[in-house]
Amino acid sequence: MAKIVTLGEIMLRLSPEGNDRFIQSESFRIIPGGGEANVAVSVANYGHDAYFVSKLPKHEIGQIALNALRRYGVNTDFIARGGERVGLYYAETGASMRPSKVIYDRAHSSIAEADPSDFDFDKIMEGAQWFHW
């Protein structure tokens, strides 16, 4: 199968249960995701060799995102580790006439502060048939 490389930010979505609003909720579900990460999971589900390139903190919160990718068979060998933050977004499901709401909190995330020297792009792209970012 094809080697497909995606590069981007995996974030953690924090969502209240059901149709609760942010201000009504005392707890949130954590769901890892993000455009390029979702593409990597999708192509892995189709049997391709999916590689995700990003940067995540070394702490347990970064590990949540890393484990989510691995659970779906995405290769995480090229995820640099460092920095302090995983990007977050809060998603509130709409109900009836109330629209859904999304609030982003991704400033100063590990990937936002990554340096090109954090990645060996020659090695990353070796044998790749497709690059998505």
Residues covered by each model-derived region:
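Glycine-rich phosphate/adenosyl-contacting loop at the front of the ribokinase-like
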Residues: 1-74, 111-117
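Conserved N-terminal subdomain of the carbohydrate kinase-like
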Residues: 49, 53-133
